[in-house]
């Protein structure tokens, strides 16, 4: 069952996103201890794990999340999400159609990336629990990212559909969250702001403060 508070501090990470002196297990556990509300396993890039290695890691990270009662979401990979019985899946505009995914994930969380009004107009949101809007700011984490849309895009979507849960993504750090919250976002999703933080507990707590009112 989806709760929009899951979106408050949404951590996204894969093996290529963590510094060389840490493992993804260490980074995730530190983030979980600090109080992230949702985790998405996003294994991308040239060095990304594949096949059984990816499956094994996904199971380990899923187990870690469940120890802290945090839902585990898989990015894009429908077969992996089904195989490990993930708590949900997040897809982009170029990935499998949401309607097709929904038949496999009737009781799971489904998220969809939307960057602009055109994508919003052509997206079927019938089975979608939340949308990820961005990039809000310039981001180094996604080389294929769109042009930054700014917090204004969140405000526009909220005006069009006030009940639609929205999580912001792209270039977000603890210094630029306020305009996102003011625009009406239900949460923020970050990669490097947490994965490369020198003090994960402090970073997560600062993010949480914006949504604890």
Curated annotation (Swiss-Prot):
Function: Condenses 4-methyl-5-(beta-hydroxyethyl)thiazole monophosphate (THZ-P) and 2-methyl-4-amino-5-hydroxymethyl pyrimidine pyrophosphate (HMP-PP) to form thiamine monophosphate (TMP).
InterPro entries per UniProt: Aldolase_TIM, ThiamineP_synth_sf, ThiamineP_synth_TenI, TMP_synthase
Gene: thiE
Keyword Zinc carried by entry: no
Residues that coordinate or bind 4-amino-2-methyl-5-(diphosphooxymethyl)pyrimidine: 40-44, 75, 113, 142
Protein name in UniProt: Thiamine-phosphate synthase
CDD domains attached to this UniProt entry: TMP_TenI
List of residues binding Mg(2+): 76, 95
Pathway(s) served: Cofactor biosynthesis; thiamine diphosphate biosynthesis; thiamine phosphate from 4-amino-2-methyl-5-diphosphomethylpyrimidine and 4-methyl-5-(2-phosphoethyl)-thiazole: step 1/1
Source organism of this protein record: Staphylococcus aureus (strain MSSA476)
Cofactor(s) for this UniProt protein: Mg(2+)
EC number: 2.5.1.3
């Amino acid at each position: 069952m989806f709760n929009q508070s899951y979106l408050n501090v949404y951590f996204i990470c894969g093996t290529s996103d963590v510094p060389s002196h840490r493992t993804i297990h260490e980074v995730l556990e530190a983030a979980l201890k600090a109080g992230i509300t949702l985790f998405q396993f996003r294994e991308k890039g040239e060095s990304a794990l594949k096949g059984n290695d990816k499956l094994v890691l996904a199971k380990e990270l899923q187990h870690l999340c469940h120890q802290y009662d945090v839902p585990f979401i898989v990015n894009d990979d429908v077969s992996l999400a089904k195989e490990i019985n993930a708590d949900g899946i997040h897809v982009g505009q170029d990935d499998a159609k949401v309607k097709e995914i929904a038949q496999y994930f009737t009781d799971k969380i489904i998220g969809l990336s939307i960057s602009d009004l055109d994508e919003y107009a052509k997206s079927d949101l019938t089975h979608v629990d939340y949308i990820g809007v961005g990039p809000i700011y310039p981001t180094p984490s996604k080389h294929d990212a769109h042009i930054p849309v700014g917090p204004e895009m969140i405000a526009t979507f909220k005006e069009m559909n006030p009940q639609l849960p929205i999580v912001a993504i792209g270039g977000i750090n603890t210094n630029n969250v306020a305009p996102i919250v003011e625009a009406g976002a239900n949460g923020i999703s970050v990669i490097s702001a947490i994965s490369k933080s020198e003090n994960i507990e402090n970073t997560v707590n600062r993010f949480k403060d914006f949504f604890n009112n």
